[in-house]
Curated annotation (Swiss-Prot):
Family: Belongs to the PqqD family.
Taxonomic source organism: Xanthomonas oryzae pv. oryzae (strain PXO99A)
UniProt-recorded name of the protein: PqqA binding protein
Functional note: Functions as a PqqA binding protein and presents PqqA to PqqE, in the pyrroloquinoline quinone (PQQ) biosynthetic pathway.
Assembly information from the UniProt record: Monomer. Interacts with PqqE.
UniProt entry keywords in alphabetical sequence: PQQ biosynthesis
Length: 92
């Protein structure tokens, strides 16, 4: 498994998609034979996993959008990314 860095450009793995689940009334990541529920924060991060933006860029966008500390946001983005990568939902 590769190390997560602020320069990583995550994208959802093939077969994984972001979808609103009406039964659960929330956004989820759908993967073969599993569903990962996303809270509001995880959703705004996951929506930016496009394979072109670095984690640092994602954090800067979110810090500007929510008027929050960029370093705190970056740490949270990296932590979420590491968790989703461990679940084999992302490629870097």
């Amino acid at each position: 498994m590769s190390s997560i860095t602020r320069d990583g450009q995550p994208a959802l793995r093939a077969g994984v998609r972001l979808q609103y689940d009406r039964a659960r009334d929330q956004w989820v990541l759908l993967a073969p034979e599993r569903v990962v529920e996303l809270d509001e924060i995880a959703l705004v991060v996951a929506q930016r996993y496009d394979g072109t933006r670095s984690l640092a860029q994602i954090a800067q966008e979110l810090a500007a959008e929510f008027d929050a500390d960029a370093a705190d946001i970056e740490a949270d983005v990296i932590e979420l990314t590491a968790t989703l990568q461990q679940k084999r939902l992302l490629r870097l």
